[in-house]
Amino acid sequence: MNREEVYLSLGSNLGNRESNLAQATIALSINFEITDIISSSYYVSEPLYNKDQPEFLNSVVKFCTTLKPFEVLDVTQKVEKMLGRSNKLVKNQPRIIDIDILFFGNSVIETEKLSIPHPMIALRKFVLLPLAEIEPDFNVPHSKITIDDLIYNCPDKSRVVRHFMDVQA
């Protein structure tokens, strides 16, 4: 079976955001068909669309899998549900966890249920910065566009900064 590299965006702005992202990453890694999981640092970002909500904590996760794209979508939706995300969320509202598939190998998929590459990547600095951290030489599949190109041309001028966790000795 072919193993594909997959990139996910994780975001949370309700509850213990650090714990939500960590639990989502752990839940993904428990799936025996997901291996070699790597997570970026966490990044704090202000909400882009609905400004009347808490700041987000975001990360990007990379892994290898033999699962197919719609199977990965199913896994991500199960993780979201396990962590308490409601299926009835209104777009751009606060959420415990949000997991989006950014890239799936060189796949290009456009259906009502799934779009790969994610259509909003180039517009979201909170996705681009953590992606560049774990994959600085990344090129968008089927193009010569680099992660640096995407960051340079990103229209998102919102504040996105690396998050440093408070660790008690």
What are these regions (language model features)?
Residues 2-10, 14-91, 95, 106:
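Nucleotide and nucleotide-moiety/phosphate-recognizing core
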